Each structure stands twice: as C-alpha cells, then as structure tokens.
Amino acid sequence: MNEQSPALRNFTINFGPQHPAAHGVLRLVLELDGEVVERVDPHIGLLHRGTEKLIETKTYLQAMPYFDRLDYVAPMNQEHAFCLAAERLLGIEVPRRGQLIRVLYSEIGRLLSHLLNVTTQAMDVGALTPPLWGFEEREKLMVFYERASGSRMHANYFRIGGVHQDLPPKLVDDIDAFCDPFLKVVDDLDQLLTGNRIFKQRNVDIGVVTLKQAWEWGFSGVMVRGSGAAWDLRKSQPYDVYAEMEFDIPIGKNGDCYDRYLIRMEEMRQSVRIMKQCIAKLRAPDGQGPVLITDNKIAPPRRGEMKRSMEALIHHFKLYTEGVHVPAGEIYAAVEAPKGEFGVYLVADGTNKPYKCKIRAPGFAHLQAMDFLCRGHLLADVSAILGSLDIVFGEVDR
C-alpha cells in the first residue's frame, strides 16, 4: 500500500504459466509498484505427479525410470543418486568400468543442462542466436544417450550395481571426437555473450546473493559457487571415480546472474576435461571388464548363461518378477547434479520395494528464493533472475 494516498494500490499480475520465459509451468504472482517488484509469489504443483508415492509401490528396478522424469534436461544424473543410495544399503562395489561410464554420462548430462540453461538465459534477455547453437550441440549429446541406452531422453540406463550394458567402442571414439569441436562452440558462445554490452547490462548486479544468504536459503551447486564458495560434491564427497579425476571448481565473487552464467560456461569446459579423462581410462587395460556387478541376486545373468544353466534362469525370473531385496536401513545419497545437490533419502524395510524415497530437488530451494531475489528489481529483471536459477519443473513439483 502506498503511503501518500489510499487510492493508489499495488498492481498484481500473473507471470506464466503460458509465458515464454516461465520455463515450463511456472506461475508467479507479481505485486508491482509501477514497474518495481514488491512481492513474488511462486505457485507450484502444476506438474505434480506424485513420484515419491509411486516409487513406494514399485520395485527398485521399476523405480529407476521415475528419476529420468524429474530433471528431464539431464536425466542420468538423478538415476545416479538413487543407484548410489541402494548400493550403499546393499554394501556393493560397482565394477570400475561401470563407474567410468556413469561418470562419463553424468558429465554429458551436465553439458545438456548447462547448454540449455545458458542459451535460454540469453534468450530470456533477448539474444536469439545462442539457443540455436546450443540445441545443435544438445542434439549430438542426445544421440550419445540414444546409442548407449536406446532412448534420447528417459534413458533408464543406470542400474543398481553398474549400468545396463557396455558402450560400443565406436561410441567411445565418437564421444572423444565430439569433445574438441564442442569447446570451440563454447568459445563461440563466450564471444557472443560474455563481453556483450546488452547481456551484461541485463545480468550484472541483478539477483545478487551473498554467501551467507545462499547457505540460509539452502542453495547448492552453481547458486553457492556464484557467491564464492568452492563447494562441489564431486570434490568434497567424491563418489564413483570422481576422486581420480582432475578438474577445477569455478567460483564467482559477486553472486549475481552474470557470475552464475560465467560459472556454467566454465563448468562446461571442465566437464569436457572430465569426459576426456574418462575416455582415456575406458581405453586403458584397467578400464576393461564388466560394467555390472556379477551377483545374480542383484543383476541379471547373461543371456548365454540362461540358455545353459537352470540356476541362471531362475535368478533371472526372480529378479524381474520380485526384484532386489534391499536390507532394512536408511541412507541419504547425494550427487552434484547440474542444478545443485540432488539427494535421495532412501528408507528400506528389507522388502523388494522402498518404504520411503524422499527426493531432495535443488531447484525447489532455488525457486522459493524468487521473492527475496526479485524484491526491488524491475519487472524485466524477473525473467533474467529466473533464467539464472536454472529451474526445471519436473524436479520442483515431482
């Protein structure tokens, strides 16, 4: 309410869900004083599918595809968290080649996510060329997904104890051949946006988050690194073969939209660095071997064995009808997903289905801060701030 006259009221508008900058099904109710944002009220739940409840009625193997449908921009990163949780409860070690393939595909997922975010963030502030370049590269990466798993998006490729099948040698060569030309595309995007006067005016000093605020709001990933903390689960709590990988963690110093953009650009370069190391290790003698654990109580036996051995046939039948029995216990497993810390809190009761599977989506904590981030900014800045948060509604609404 304005001080001077009771007749002057704030103006309320709906931003989305049909808005092009609303990234899916976001609905923001904005309260404006002129063109200055006074209050932002995000309305969520338009993509709610009851994932956590559905997982309780499915076996551990059947629950896997639900994770692809959370952050559907980088699907395999979520499967990773669920697999890690179940593996820790089972107390099993994934074969080295399986770990390498997982890390390789997690980094491909990071590229998929950052490419989409950086280019659509640019589109939200008016640059129309980057999305066209970004989608061309994403297309190539999705073909790599398809060649590994048979599906472009909802891969369902990771398994408890490794991955579903080995990569063909030609695919490893093609991923290797993709890396260097891709860095050139990142440089082209860099040239187009980083020094661009309009892009900087729209992003510098917009949506500033101090490090203290980032911790208080429960931020993770790029949102924390943009404010100056070198916090990355791949370094601080390494999983699979990340401990062997050499890469740097880019951090910002201003905590604004521009810093977050720069970090995502640098993270793409670091991801390519990790991918190259994975490919070298996959080709090395110690990178050969099985991609899935050989325990037939957890992973299916090979087709050839099933034709010869009755035991293998029984194992196969039991595994796909009844599923894996995970020992009772509870565990929290988190991975450094492209959007932040994606965690799975898994409670097992000794049966073939999870008792409870709580999903900690990074985008949820970031979206709830929209009000605090946008207050005092102009209406046009709302889409710039939203673009830098990197929100996907599959994981927010679950």
Swiss-Prot record:
Example of a GO cellular component annotation carried by this entry: plasma membrane
A Pfam family recorded for this sequence: Complex1_49kDa
Topology with respect to the bilayer: Peripheral membrane protein
NCBIfam families for the chain: NuoD, PRK06075.1
Record field: catalytic activity: a quinone + NADH + 5 H(+)(in) = a quinol + NAD(+) + 4 H(+)(out)
InterPro entries: NADH_Q_OxRdtase_suD, NADH_UbQ_OxRdtase_49kDa_CS, NDH1_su_D/H, NiFe-Hase_large
Protein family per UniProt: Belongs to the complex I 49 kDa subunit family.
Signal peptide region: none
EC number(s) stated in the UniProt entry for this protein: 7.1.1.-
Description of how the protein assembles with itself and partners: NDH-1 is composed of 14 different subunits. Subunits NuoB, C, D, E, F, and G constitute the peripheral sector of the complex.
HAMAP family given in the database record: NDH1_NuoD (MF_01358)
Name assigned to this protein: NADH-quinone oxidoreductase subunit D
Keywords: Cell inner membrane, Cell membrane, Membrane, NAD, Quinone, Translocase, Transport, Ubiquinone
Gene: nuoD
GO molecular function: NAD binding; NADH:ubiquinone reductase (non-electrogenic) activity; quinone binding
Compartment(s): Cell inner membrane
The protein's role, per its UniProt record: NDH-1 shuttles electrons from NADH, via FMN and iron-sulfur (Fe-S) centers, to quinones in the respiratory chain. The immediate electron acceptor for the enzyme in this species is believed to be ubiquinone. Couples the redox reaction to proton translocation (for every two electrons transferred, four hydrogen ions are translocated across the cytoplasmic membrane), and thus conserves the redox energy in a proton gradient.
SUPFAM superfamilies named in the record: HydB/Nqo4-like
